[in-house]
A protein has these predicted regions:
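Amphipathic alpha-helical scaffolding segments comprising HEAT/armadillo-like alpha-solenoid repeats
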Residues: 2-13, 40-53, 76-86, 107-109
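Solvent-exposed, amphipathic alpha-helical segments
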Residues: 8-19, 30-33
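Alpha-helical interaction scaffolds
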Residues: 14-15, 78, 89-108
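Alpha-solenoid helical repeat architecture
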Residues: 17, 52-56, 71, 86, ...
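HEAT-repeat alpha-solenoid elements in large eukaryotic scaffold proteins
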Residues: 18-29, 44, 53-57
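Structural detector for internal amphipathic alpha-helices that build alpha-solenoid repeat scaffolds
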Residues: 25-39, 62-73, 95-107
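Structural detector for tandem alpha-solenoid helical repeats, activating at a conserved register
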Residues: 43, 62, 77, 92-93
Length: 109
């Protein structure tokens, strides 16, 4: 199987829609592909946060938590793009990430 470029995976994530039955496995597979085959960098953040904006109430049956855990496992400084995303459209998981980030920052001082 040919490894796809990061921008191809991100494009598919950006265009993802769950099935009418509420099947999110396609996004789960795309996130797995992104985390396992590419070096996630700052350029990925807007696309990943747009998923939160498109589905602000997280009806993903836990799939979008993969974005939270994936980003939090990197050493990326994601606070600014997260705040920009929340300014465009508040989302449940975006708010959770911001709260966790602020809590971690406060405890690290």
């Amino acid at each position: 199987m040919k490894m796809r470029l990061q921008n191809e995976i991100l494009s598919d994530i950006d265009q993802f829609e769950p099935s009418p039955e509420g099947d999110w496995r396609g996004l789960d597979a795309l996130l797995t592909e992104l985390w396992q085959t590419t070096k996630v960098n700052e350029a990925c953040l807007p696309v990943l946060f747009r998923v939160f904006e498109r589905f602000p109430d997280d009806s993903s049956a836990g799939v979008c938590w993969g974005i939270v855990h994936g980003i939090e496992s990197t050493d990326l400084d994601y606070e600014k793009p997260l705040r920009e995303s929340l300014a465009r459209r508040s989302s449940e998981l975006g708010q959770i990430m911001l709260h966790r980030l602020e809590k971690w920052t406060a405890s690290a001082q």
